């Protein structure tokens, strides 16, 4: 019975231990994971069997059947391996967006138009998690300029870059920079972060349901990312090298280890590429690899006379949201018309090349001239590097050691001695200075 019901079975290309299938439910199609521990899959099989046979079967029987079907697929060398999408898919020059509603309705964007479509046998494979919330139905005939109204509402300091960055989040499968939002109390960083999440990949209607704490350890990080297309991490205070490495791999796509379900020591590899947002009061991004993979937004504290209540902000946002989505989708339709020619016209870049290409196409589709986005993006990156340079205390010491020279050859021990002499003379006690010659070597590395 279960074998007849399942259609288009596929192994996930990002996690070779997971198997998905498409099944008919009432008058539409859905994807199910063949997992004997998944309550939704168990419930589907029990109800489907009852509807045809009027017989009840236990959870144990259903779990055995589903487990058998899964292993059969995994052991069959002819089984298809496919990308199983979450919320968004960019396939064959078309963008699919899962609205998260019952009945599995999607928005399909192509160069020729935008349509509301049903999920079906010919659709790309999608899955949903308990974090896949319902999205507002977009208004494809938006009134006014909703994106401009949004940036006024959140008072973002670099609005043109923000709009391009936000729209790029709907392009699945390609690395796009992380949102890095800083702001003290009263700057609305949490509200801003929640609105971004709710525009792209809502998990609910409140800040609490859309924002989460950064997880401890790589295993928890992978689990946290796996549940959402866009993960928004709240109140980041410090980004160490381990966190930097995990974020970089998740942004551009990389392999993470995953423990097997059994105590046999087996370790599997899971490939993760996700859209990410982080916010905090005053975290610093010190590694150039992560710096290249983020766009930073420093929100100013909003004066008391300009502050709005959460209820008022929510009312404005809810009114704007259908038009924001409609405007974004219409811009993406224009992007798909010109993306190939834009890619051919741009010089090769080593840093976030896919974002550079799509950013340029998005900016042109918003009415700007060719090449203007590349200048805007380069200016942003240079500002980040300059701020990193200015905020690093050792740089100022090295500049004094160099004096008028362009280059001096010194050992790490000699550099440490000089830094210590200058710090003592200037009564400088910043904890960011190297504590030894090895500290100098680590800083250089």
Give the ranges of each region predicted by the language model.
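Conserved AAA+/SF3 P-loop NTPase catalytic/coupling segment centered on the Walker-B
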Residues: 229-251, 283-292
């Amino acid at each position: 019975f279960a074998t007849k019901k399942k259609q288009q079975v596929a192994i996930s290309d990002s996690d070779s231990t997971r198997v998905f299938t498409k099944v008919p439910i009432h008058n539409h199609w859905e994807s199910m994971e063949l997992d004997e521990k998944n309550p939704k899959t168990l419930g589907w099989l029990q109800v489907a069997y009852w509807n045809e046979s009027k017989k009840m079967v236990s959870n144990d029987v259903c779990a055995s059947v589903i487990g058998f079907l899964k292993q059969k697929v995994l052991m069959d060398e002819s089984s298809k391996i496919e990308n199983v999408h979450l919320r968004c898919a960019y396939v064959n020059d078309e963008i699919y967006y899962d609205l998260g509603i019952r009945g599995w309705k999607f928005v399909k964007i192509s160069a020729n138009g935008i349509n509301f479509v049903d999920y079906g046998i010919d659709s790309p494979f999608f899955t949903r998690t308990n974090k896949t919330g319902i999205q507002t139905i977009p208004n494809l005939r938006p009134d006014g300029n909703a994106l401009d109204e949004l940036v006024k509402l959140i008072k973002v300091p670099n609005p043109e870059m923000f709009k391009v960055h936000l729209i790029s989040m709907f392009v699945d499968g390609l690395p796009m920079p992380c949102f890095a939002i800083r702001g003290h109390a009263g700057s609305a960083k949490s509200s801003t972060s929640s609105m971004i999440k709710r525009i792209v990949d809502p998990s609910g209607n409140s800040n609490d349901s859309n924002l989460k704490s950064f997880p401890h350890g790589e295993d928890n990080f992978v689990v946290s990312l796996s549940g959402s297309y866009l993960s928004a991490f709240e109140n980041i205070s410090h980004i160490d090298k381990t966190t930097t490495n995990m974020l970089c791999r998740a942004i551009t796509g990389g392999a993470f280890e995953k423990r097997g379900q059994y105590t046999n020591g087996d370790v599997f590899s899971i490939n993760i590429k996700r859209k990410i947002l982080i916010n905090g009061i005053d975290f610093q991004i010190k590694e150039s690899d992560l710096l290249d993979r983020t766009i930073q937004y420093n929100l100013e504290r909003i004066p008391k006379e300009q502050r709005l209540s959460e209820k008022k902000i929510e009312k404005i946002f809810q009114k704007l949201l259908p038009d924001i989505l409609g405007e974004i989708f219409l811009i993406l339709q224009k992007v798909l018309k010109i993306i190939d020619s834009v890619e051919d016209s741009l010089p090769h870049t080593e840093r976030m090349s896919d974002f550079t290409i799509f950013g340029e196409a998005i900016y042109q589709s918003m009415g700007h001239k060719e090449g203007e986005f590349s200048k805007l993006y380069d200016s942003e990156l240079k500002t980040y590097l300059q701020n990193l340079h200015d905020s690093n205390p050792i740089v100022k010491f090295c500049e004094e050691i160099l004096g008028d020279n362009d280059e001096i050859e010194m050992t790490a021990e000699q550099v440490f001695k000089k830094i210590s002499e200058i710090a003592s003379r200037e009564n400088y006690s910043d904890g960011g200075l190297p504590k030894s010659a090895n500290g100098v070597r680590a800083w250089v590395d």
